[in-house]
Amino acid sequence: MSEEVWNGNQGILSVYVSKARDLPNLNKLDKQNVMLRLRIAHMTRASNTLHRAGQNPVFHYLEKFDITPEIKPLMYVEVYCDRRKKSPLPIGRCEIDLLNAIRADPKEGYCTWYELKRSGDEFAGTIFIELTFTPKVPRLNRDDLNKEMDRLDSSMAMRPIPPLPTESEYDYVHGSTMRQITPQCVSTSHEDKDEGQPYRNGNVFSMSSKSDTAVLANSNDPIILPPTFSASMGTTSTLETNDTAISNTSNTKFHFANLRKLKEKINIFKNPDSSTNNCQNESNKVDIEALQKAIGVTSLSYDEDDDDDDENDAFYSSSHRVSHNYNQPPLPPIPTRDDMSNYSSSRNTPLVRRDRPSRLDSSSPNSHPHPSGLNSPKLPPLPTTSNSNFNSRKNSMSPTRKRPPPRLS
């Protein structure tokens, strides 16, 4: 069994003995009375006697023990056969290690079957026991809390203050400055290595007080390699890229200068009367055909083409305007004063009946023909008695109205 002492927090151990089975029967003529006894260190608990329990007793016995770190985590379980007038007879016993129960979850616990033994390791049945350990949380008083806080403050005050970042043995060097000076350091280091000068770790760069540019050490001093920037050595490829960039810019500047000269000559050709042309000598005349071939232009008659385009546009617009006028119908003549007076007098005359012949007479000198009446159809003549097609009411075939009945006197 385990011999270690539990050094954890103190708590309460709950022991629940459920039942036992296959116990030997010590009474030959009757069923035996069974009792249970539990012991942890100096603490002993005994159950009530179960009368006539026999070989498969059911205990349902619960007991609690206060566990402290000084108590050995071991429990003894003993089962007895109780006799009224005599001392009880031991049926079986077992030892249970409590560390499994103490380390288990308090909500689940630890339960299993344990074997009982008699003297000489003889089998005496099994017993089912459930163990649950609930630790006690220590409660600190205010005085204890204050002591703990004071102790923590004193320990933090005794700690040394770390040095500031500025108090380093090497000066600060920016990355851009390091890129510019690293190739020079590499070249000087290779040259001095061939000469056999010694190397030592230190600060290669010294920041001047007037500016923030890094300056190499004196040529008389031994070469000093920087300890922190050794990985950035050997960047000679950056110099090659700079050379190519410079060559490209020089070529572009040359082409721009040639184009500027050609543009000036073209302006002189277009504006011969300008002040710039008067200042130049006659010997600076330009061959137009050669200039056109050099530039890649077929002709320089931009002004003539523009004039021709303007003339074509003007002719097209004028012809389009005339054709548009021909398609429109002719406008009516402008009315005169006499026509206006006649029209107003005709509007002021009163209305006449339809049977008056003067309304339909178009030969009157004062009548003004309305444009809408020229194309209107003629009205049919009114029916008269002389017309042969006219039928009187008497000769009509339609039924007549029924006469009213005679009045009674």
UniProtKB/Swiss-Prot annotation:
GO:BP terms for this protein? chromosome organization; mitotic cytokinesis; mitotic cytokinetic process; secondary cell septum biogenesis
Here the segments flagged for biased composition (Acidic residues) are 302-313
Q: What region holds the C2 domain?
A: 1-114
GO terms for molecular function, please? enzyme regulator activity
Q: Which CDD domains match?
A: C2_fungal_Inn1p-like (cd08681)
Compositional bias segments (type: Polar residues): 315-328, 384-399
Biased composition of type Low complexity is found at 360-377
Report residue spans for region: Disordered. 300-409
Compartment list: Bud neck
Q: Where is the composition biased (Basic residues)?
A: 400-409
The record's GO CC annotations read: cellular bud neck; cellular bud neck contractile ring; cleavage furrow; cytoplasm; HICS complex; membrane
Signal peptide start-end: none
UniProt-listed InterPro entries: C2_dom (IPR000008), C2_domain_sf (IPR035892), C2_fungal_Inn1 (IPR037791), Ingression_C2_domain (IPR052981)
Q: Which UniProt keywords apply?
A: Cell cycle, Cell division, Mitosis, Phosphoprotein
Q: Which residues carry this modification: Phosphoserine?
A: 392
Q: Which family does this protein fall into?
A: Belongs to the INN1/fic1 family.
Q: What does this protein do?
A: Required for the ingression of the plasma membrane into the bud neck at the end of cytokinesis, leading to the separation of the mother and daughter cells. Stimulates the synthesis of the primary septum (PS) by CHS2.
| Domain notes per entry | The C2 domain is essential for membrane ingression during cytokinesis, but not for recruitment to the actomyosin ring.
Q: Subunit details for this protein?
A: Interacts with CYK2, CYK3 and IQG1.
Protein name per UniProt: Ingression protein 1
Organism from which the protein derives: Saccharomyces cerevisiae (strain ATCC 204508 / S288c)
